[in-house]
């Protein structure tokens, strides 16, 4: 919850928002974000309207973690559930790599490649349905007049 933007602010208010170990002192809150310095002079008024970093929390698909990054892979259709949308002090957006299945081939020829999109966008909490399709079916023919199938959603 964001700290108030006016009025009296106490060390207890700051500790409630940002955590820390008692006994509290301002020096434990060098944050380096939201206008709060990471070193040097720090004052109570620098905390007005600030909030602790919050990051997107989500579930769904097959999940793997690499460092601070969490990846959700969808091999079949299903829900991507966002339980925490994060905030500007942490992260409130997601990156998506969407790869489409290619078309089917004919005879001895290969099919066309699928397209892709790389996106970065803000999210809100809730369920997002992910549709996974497949590539097009190939066709065998002694003649090159039979085409392969189109890829699906």
Language-model region placement:
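Glycine-biased low-complexity/repetitive sequence motifs
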Residues: 2-153
């Amino acid at each position: 919850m964001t700290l108030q933007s006016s009025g009296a602010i106490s060390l207890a208010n700051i500790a409630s928002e940002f955590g820390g170990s008692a006994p509290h002192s301002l020096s434990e809150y060098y944050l380096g974000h939201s206008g709060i310095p990471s070193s040097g002079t720090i004052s109570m008024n620098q905390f007005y309207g600030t909030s602790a970093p919050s990051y997107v929390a989500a579930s769904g698909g097959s999940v793997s973690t690499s460092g601070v990054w969490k990846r959700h892979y969808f091999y079949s259709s299903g829900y991507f559930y966002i339980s925490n949308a994060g905030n500007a002090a942490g992260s409130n957006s997601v990156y998506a790599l969407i790869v489409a299945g290619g078309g089917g081939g004919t005879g001895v020829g290969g099919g066309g490649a699928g397209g892709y999109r790389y996106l970065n966008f803000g999210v809100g909490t809730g369920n997002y349905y992910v549709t996974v399709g497949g590539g097009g079916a190939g066709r065998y023919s002694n003649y090159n007049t039979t085409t392969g199938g189109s890829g699906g959603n």
